[in-house]
Amino acid sequence: MDMENLTWLHGKPTASGILKANPEDFVVVEDLGFEPDGEGEHLLVRIRKNGCNTQFVADYLARFAKLHPRLVSYAGLKDRHAVTEQWFCLHLPGKEAPDLATFELEGCEVLEAVRHKRKLRIGSLKGNAFTLVLRHITDRQDVEQRLQQIAAQGVPNYFGSQRFGRGGNNLVQARLWANNEIRVKERSKRSFYLSASRSAMFNLISSHRLAQQLSTTVLEGDALQLSGRGSWFVAQADELATLQQRVTAGELNITAPLPGDSELGTHGEALAFEQACLAEQTELLSLIKRERVEGSRRAVLLKPQNMISNWWDDVTLELSFWLPAGSFATSVVREIMNQDRADDTDIIE
């Protein structure tokens, strides 16, 4: 998936700069959205890590606690080329907690450990707080104007390049799999390839909506989502004026599909628009249906919360903001500046 071909909401930036000159320039802190219970057969462990990916730390925790790897879980993957604070969950039914004071892994620090009644599962995360440092910025005035636009209107809610693997390989493999040119047995690879397929189709439809200036224009049959919620409903023709007002006010979001084996969910004009966008994606659609993946919807636009900018000097910007789970910080940066050096560091979920 070539991110350069996707439409910008605020036009292509004139400024360029560097994201993540070092890992400390990309800091991510998980927000579970709940407080641990303080009791239960699960142990939630919050770890600050630098230079370690999520699965590596989870496997190390399993060995340290003498647990099967399946008994250690987490809410979302984080890249190793960043400073991240994330939670891991150890299932310890009837067992004492391991002595985490003796836990040693280069680049990792245990911040706290709390008992909890439920397993921490993928996606059981409210969001993430980011603190980024953008360096060697060439046009401060353009960046400042874009920050104001982003605060008011948001950014496209695109899946970032990491979703598609290095060089887009996950999508390449998905197409080979769809055409029965390869067999994919590993569960993790199947998941990556299917996720890349659905994400690419979402990005494509969202980009077309932006290109036709329809990112905030309600079509008859659109699937609309209450801001901050996952559920959605279909816009009826006799409600368009009222629904348009609610979208403009930020109460509702227009969505695009993450296609599955069921119908897209839209009707009428909106359905025709989405079908036209997907007309040339028969390979990926057939794969999704063949593997019986459940479909869902995702907001076309994303508005960062609690966004604060702090210029260290005329070419260095510290930027902090909060995003809901599943959203990509690089999709925010993409609307601010062109990156002089490509870097796939990002949050995955």
Curated annotation (Swiss-Prot):
The organism of origin for this protein: Yersinia pseudotuberculosis serotype O:1b (strain IP 31758)
Record-annotated active site: 79 (nucleophile)
UniProtKB keywords: Isomerase, tRNA processing
Its biological purpose: Responsible for synthesis of pseudouridine from uracil-13 in transfer RNAs.
Top EC class, one word: isomerase
Binding locations of substrate: 26, 128, 328
Full protein name: tRNA pseudouridine synthase D
Family: Belongs to the pseudouridine synthase TruD family.
Family annotation (SUPFAM superfamilies): Pseudouridine synthase
PANTHER family: TRNA PSEUDOURIDINE SYNTHASE D
Encoding gene per record: truD
EC number(s) recorded for this UniProt protein: 5.4.99.27
GO CC entries: cytosol
Domain TRUD: 154-302
Biological-process GO terms, alphabetical: tRNA pseudouridine synthesis
Catalytic activity line of the entry: uridine(13) in tRNA = pseudouridine(13) in tRNA
CDD domains the record matches: PseudoU_synth_EcTruD
